[in-house]
């Protein structure tokens, strides 16, 4: 399973285990 990389407002990838966190703008 390939997940898209999600970045926070600082441009750092967010990931906990195998789950990505998506911040709402």
Curated annotation (Swiss-Prot):
Keywords: Protease inhibitor, Serine protease inhibitor, Thiol protease inhibitor. InterPro entries: Prot_inh_Kunz-lg. It comes from the Eukaryota. Cortex of tuber. One of its GO terms (molecular function) is cysteine-type endopeptidase inhibitor activity. Belongs to the protease inhibitor I3 (leguminous Kunitz-type inhibitor) family. Inhibitor of subtilisin. Inhibits moderately trypsin and chymotrypsin (serine proteases). May protect the plant by inhibiting proteases of invading organisms. This is Cysteine protease inhibitor 2. The lineage of its organism: Eukaryota, Viridiplantae, Streptophyta, Embryophyta, Tracheophyta.
